[in-house]
């Protein structure tokens, strides 16, 4: 089913808007502006995923920083495209990007507590919860998980 899945770094305005839409749909409590997305293109490795011409998901790979020596891998799949193998394929690509950044780094992810599909997916990939927190002004917790 994933044979026609296509991923790319968002470059055009439309691709940036597609990435933004996926993020803001999957993480509705933390909307990003297009300027936020442009910033992420510069700081992180991000991909937008299409099935044919239909946007179905996105990834973010955050490199290690002084504050966090882990590489953070985030996979987002729009609800109507879940349970079809796309998340697994996107995770495989994002994990490869993470290993390119820092082969021996700890791998972490973050999931919104109100996204049970995302939490279940992360746990099936071998991630275990390490922390729950709510950002100032937010009402839904984020869950940090580490690859065991």
Can you say where each PLM-predicted feature lies in the sequence?
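Short amphipathic alpha-helix that is part of the acyltransferase structural core
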Residues: 1-34, 143
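C-terminal "cap" of GNAT-fold acetyltransferases
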Residues: 2-3, 132-148
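Short loop/turn motifs at secondary-structure junctions and domain boundaries
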Residues: 37-42
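Short acidic/glycine-enriched loop/turn segments that link adjacent beta-strands
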Residues: 43, 67-69, 115, 136-141
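Conserved beta-strand in the GNAT
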Residues: 48, 54-63, 70-72, 76
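A short, internal acetyl-CoA/4′-phosphopantetheine-binding micro-motif in the GNAT/acyltransferase core
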Residues: 74-83, 111-112
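Conserved active-site alpha-helix within GNAT-family acetyltransferase domains
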Residues: 88-92, 102-103, 112-132, 138-139
């Amino acid at each position: 089913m994933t044979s026609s899945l296509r991923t790319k770094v968002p470059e055009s305005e439309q691709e940036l808007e597609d990435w933004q839409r996926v993020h803001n749909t999957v993480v509705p409590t933390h909307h990003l502006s297009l300027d936020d997305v442009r910033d992420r293109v510069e700081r992180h490795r991000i991909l937008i995923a299409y099935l044919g011409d239909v946007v179905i998901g996105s990834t973010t790979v955050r490199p290690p920083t002084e504050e966090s020596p882990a590489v953070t891998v985030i996979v987002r799949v729009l609800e109507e495209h879940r349970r079809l193998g796309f998340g697994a394929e996107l995770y495989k690509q994002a994990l490869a990007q993470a290993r390119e950044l820092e082969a021996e780094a700890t791998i972490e992810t973050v999931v919104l507590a109100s996204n049970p599909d995302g939490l279940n997916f992360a746990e099936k990939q071998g991630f275990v919860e390490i922390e729950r927190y709510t950002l100032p002004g937010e009402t839904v917790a984020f869950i940090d998980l580490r690859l065991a």
